[in-house]
């Protein structure tokens, strides 16, 4: 569907238009999520919060700040199924990713939930 048609469809149908998420933001979400998975033992023992899988939303509620310094994410994680089962998270991670989304700039926290 052409961009103009999508815009017209959204306007006339009363549906909200989706915000565009930059490629750098998508890379940043993926990098932050994969860093946390690898560092915390792999998917067999650790799964980040569901917001970290929402690349179309740029990280959703996990994205705390996006500016010229890059992307700052704060999210929890736990054993596989922790959110679906309603159990407590076992980790909390604060990670800053470069503005281009390609480098972990700083991990200010990766420990027990605060």
Over which residues does each language-model region extend?
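Bacterial N-terminal signal peptides that target proteins for export
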Residues: 1-4
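Cleavable N-terminal signal peptides
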Residues: 6-7, 17
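Residues embedded in well-ordered secondary-structure elements
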Residues: 8, 21, 62-64
